[in-house]
């Protein structure tokens, strides 16, 4: 079993402090997450056998982000790139590395060797957003991807909901019967509590 790398709590706090949770920062975070999820879906539709759990997670994330983008007021999109600050770039790089680690831990394969940007080079202009991402904002993109086809193959007819039954109560003579060890221990604990 492949183990994951643990991050220190202080590293997580520093990253959270750098994130901007204003409406614009939150929207850029959601857009970065949506772009990464779409990339993962497109890569996973390749020649290897897809993992159902992975597709369910990605599909649910995409649906939540799409619903959030529909509910949010649509601001006029400037012709400038979506990622303007180094915080957005480092956030998307962090999310991308986490998802790659998740892939390797689930698949058991070696991660692709992508060069990690050193801290000194983060001041450079981040890459332009993919046109695929802008296309993903339209509601028909997710409908064309065929993600729902994965769930049609699941046979749920054998799974019937049974009425919830109360768990059977154990016989009272087995637990805390007078004279048993547990009963004496409980009496002793109560004497200590009441005596203090």
From Swiss-Prot:
Disulfide bonds: none
Name by which UniProt lists this protein: SERTA domain-containing protein 3
Domain SERTA, first and last residues per copy: 26-73
Highest taxon in the source lineage: Eukaryota
Any Gene Ontology CC annotation: nucleus
Alphabetical UniProt keywords: Activator, Nucleus, Transcription, Transcription regulation
TM spans (from-to): none
Compartmental location: Nucleus
Gene that produces this protein: SERTAD3
Stretches for region Disordered: 1-21, 104-125
Pfam family, one: SERTA
